[in-house]
Amino acid sequence: MLKQRTIKSIVKTVGIGVHSGRKVELTLRPAAPDTGIVFSRVDLPTPVDIPASALSIGDTRLASVLQKDGVRVSTVEHLMSACAGLGIDNLYVDVTAEEIPIMDGSAATFVFLIQSAGIEEQNAAKKFIKVTKPVEIRDGDKFARLDPYFGFKLKFTIDFRHPAVDKTGQELEVDFANTSYVREIARARTFGFAHEVEMMRELGLARGGSMDNAIVLDEYRILNNDGLRYDDEFVKHKMLDAIGDLYVIGHPLLASYTAYKSGHGLNNALLRELLAHEQAYEIVTFDDPKTAPTGFGFDAQTAFA
């Protein structure tokens, strides 16, 4: 059977929260089958566990934020994206603040941590959410949609009307049957505009943001000396975010995702819309890995390779 996965050993790192600017210690620990991805605020007098769940996402204005009884864990999308890309089903994530550290602004550090810990198959069937009917959410001209598809593919279109973004392409379509998440998506960094960063800092946000963890643009160009990691890094980062946002549903999706100018809020609304229509999906497992969609085998150590 196609089995669930966790990590083999505990790994730790330290970073800063992109909005608080505060130091955050992050520890990843193995978890038993059917645990899911569970975030734990270990800095509190009594640690609070918050399982990743579409219905636990609260604030989505600047990041995807898990909330439970007034306790928050913010900016979970890059780590969740890495877990999706590497096929991690079960994991404990201990943090000493309310933000997951931003690291370099991509999912690459989290991929490295998970690969360093080692990936271990578990004696339990991996569960997928198979979309059986189309589901769509719209907000003005923005939309996000899931269609039935035996695999996982995404088509994302952005519209930033900026010379540097225009040059790199505003649309990307990826099918993970023939694309490596680690090579092609994981290193894409978050990005922002210099004038917006200043406004956010005046509001007490983006205190940890810098060119070490984001692509920064002025009105005309990219300000980072080292330029881009991918020719189409902007749209690839939006896809990286979407993969993480979608993975909070608790299992990998078997679906085709299409989005235009979508963000954390619309992605979460799409998951809630799917879950509200039980006839639009089913939970499936694969007794024979050969019958599973291409790209979910364990041999390559990744889900999408």
Curated annotation (Swiss-Prot):
**Signal sequence bounds:** none
Q: Which co-factors does it depend on? A: Zn(2+)
Q: Name one GO cellular component term.
A: membrane
- Output the GO biological process annotations, alphabetical, semicolon-separated: lipid A biosynthetic process
Is Heme among the key words of this record? no
State any single GO MF term: UDP-3-O-acyl-N-acetylglucosamine deacetylase activity
Q: Does the keyword ATP-binding apply?
A: no
The protein's matches in PANTHER family, at most eight in alphabetical order, are given as: UDP-3-O-ACYL-N-ACETYLGLUCOSAMINE DEACETYLASE 1, MITOCHONDRIAL-RELATED
What is the recorded function of this protein according to its Swiss-Prot or TrEMBL entry?
Answer: Catalyzes the hydrolysis of UDP-3-O-myristoyl-N-acetylglucosamine to form UDP-3-O-myristoylglucosamine and acetate, the committed step in lipid A biosynthesis.
UniProt record similarity statement: Belongs to the LpxC family.
Recorded protein name is UDP-3-O-acyl-N-acetylglucosamine deacetylase
